Amino acid sequence: DTGWSHAYMDECFKREGIDTMLKNGEIEFLFVSHEHLDHFWGLQTVLKYNPEIKIIIPETFYPEGMHLIKGAEFITPGACNRIPHQGKLVQLKIGETNKLYEGCAAVAFDLPIVIRVRGEQSLFFNVKDKGLVCVTGCCHQSILTMADYGQQKIAGGETMYGVYGGLHIAPFGPLNERGEKIVKGMAKYNFKKVACNHCTGLPAVNRMIELGYPVVQGTGSNGSKSNLYVGNGDEVTFG
């Protein structure tokens, strides 16, 4: 994903060395989980350093999203990309398991999401001698839906090892009944590492900790809300 603000993402890229990696072709592709502004509108910053990078999106992208990739400006919402994409664009079909490379698969889930967005794609990694790791953008489909898919249809799914990314459980306030159900439902997968971040929400993280889940702590740096879970600039190793 690309973040939202061009200036902020440029700052982050330089801080973490992503700008150099993009320029040197060390990053094989850009995987955009869904069309929400905080995951997609920072596209120009990526293309600034490598306009030919391969981009992978779900097939549910709206025409406006496709136009943004090609180079467009939308005045009212404030989205723009002045660097047209020149590389390969791959659209993943909903509900299919797509092998990206050995040990890594992508799946696009079909669902309506707030602010006129449809569909979200996520990643599964089969880590040798560990098990399956679920990697998400926001996981609007819910981590339960994603983990069930991994268990049933992805090689290595008999052992669910870890989670990384946003889980969209309590992003804007207290943990509600649905959020409580999701958090409690995670227990059946027996994850060994829960590296949740972004839209998971601190109330959900606190509940996971209360239930004894192995939540990976962060550093609380670079504007992160808390060190109780992974934040900006933090790294997690699953191998």
Please place each PLM-identified region on the residue numbering.
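Conserved beta-strand hairpin/beta-sheet module of binuclear metal-dependent hydrolase folds
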Residues: D1-E16, E120-T136
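Pre-active-site segment of Zn-dependent metallo-hydrolases
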Residues: D1-F29, I143-L144, G150-K153
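Active-site neighborhood of phospho(di)ester-bond hydrolases with catalytic His/Asp-centered motifs
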Residues: D1-T2, E26-H36, I56-E59, C134-C138, ...
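Active-site environment of divalent metal-dependent phosphoester hydrolases
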Residues: H6-A7, E35-G42, Y62-G65, H140-L144, ...
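Active-site HxH/HxHxD metal-binding segment of metal-dependent hydrolases
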Residues: G25-L92, E96, A187-K193, I209, ...
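Active-site-proximal loop/helix segment associated with metal-binding centers of metalloenzymes
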Residues: G71-E73, P77-K130
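Charged helix-capping and loop-helix junction motifs
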Residues: L175-G185
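Binuclear metal-ion centers of metallo-dependent hydrolases, dominated by the metallo-beta-lactamase
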Residues: G185-G239
